[in-house]
Design a protein with these regions (language model features):
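NAD(P)H dinucleotide-binding glycine-rich loop of Rossmann-like/cofactor-binding domains
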Residues: 46, 85-148
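Glycine-rich beta-strand-centered segment in the early N-terminal region that forms part
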Residues: 22-40, 51-93
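Glycine-rich cofactor phosphate-binding loops and adjacent beta1-alpha1 units
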Residues: 169, 184, 188-233
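Phosphate-coordination loops involved in phosphoryl transfer and adenosine-cofactor binding
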Residues: 1, 83, 140-142, 207
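Mid-domain Rossmann-like dinucleotide-binding core that forms the NAD(H)/NADP(H) cofactor-binding site
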Residues: 81, 119-194, 223
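Cytochrome P450 core scaffold surrounding the K-helix E-X-X-R motif
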Residues: 43-49
């Protein structure tokens, strides 16, 4: 058995309780992680409040990212081994002593990072890297526009894009949030409640890539803000 933090009923933080659960067993292509640290993300708070349901077949325990040591490997796992330190993206279950996830969702702890630091990488850094750099192909010198710059994804995207030499533009919902985006390295931060981002980007020659986590009416406006041959992710 293992210790885990479970949600007794939807509500405030006091509905989180320590409980005993069976240690998960890895299936094919999966690993069991002995958790050292678990990240805290917005979906965890939403799940606690009864506003987020885990994916079908996932653990009902909160926790979407964690770091630790691989305790067991399922059949067919290659490139990972028992005792290896990793950080991992989870479908749920990170608030426990052990958690199971796909081996493909694990990343060796980067050089210079300890397990505490590594626990905060999967949820936002995996998302930004796969969407902005692998799918979007962001390159140094390109104009990069992202919406929701003060969110977890947004703050990560600003820093990564700036580190790789892109020009970063962002939108946020208040002047204070815009200032925070500028402090993180954005070249321009637009308060979308007061200013339209489309003419601003058109004046810059258009965005080479836009990361949109909003959708809806923003899709048409994003297309107007794109440069020729720009990419909307």
């Amino acid at each position: 058995m293992m210790r885990a933090i479970e949600i007794s009923a939807p509500g405030a933080p006091d509905v989180l309780h320590l409980a005993e659960r069976p240690v998960p067993v890895p299936g094919p292509g999966q690993v069991v992680l002995k958790v050292a640290y678990a990240g805290v993300n917005r979906p965890d708070a939403l799940q606690r409040a009864g506003l987020y349901n885990p994916p079908a077949g996932a653990s009902d325990l909160p926790g979407l990212e964690a770091s630790g040591t691989i305790a067991a490997c399922g059949a067919g796992v290659l490139g990972l081994q028992q005792g290896q330190q990793v950080c991992a993206l989870l479908p749920g279950g990170g608030y426990a002593e052990y958690a199971v996830t796909q081996a493909a969702h694990c990343l060796p702890v980067p050089n210079g990072f300890d397990l505490k630091q590594a626990a905060c990488l999967p949820e936002t850094f995996f998302t930004v890297w796969s969407n902005v750099f692998q799918r979007g192909g962001l390159k140094a010198g390109e104009r990069f526009l992202l919406h929701g710059g003060s969110s977890g994804i947004g703050t990560t995207a600003i820093q990564l894009a700036r580190a790789f030499g892109a020009r970063v533009f962002t939108t946020a919902g208040s002047d204070a949030k815009c200032r925070a985006c500028l402090d993180l390295g954005a070249e321009r931060a637009v308060n979308y409640r007061e200013t339209d981002f489309v003419p601003i980007m058109q004046g810059e020659g258009g965005a080479d890539i836009i990361l949109d986590m909003v959708g809806g009416e923003y899709i048409a406006r994003n297309l107007d803000a794109l440069a020729d041959d720009g990419r909307l992710v």
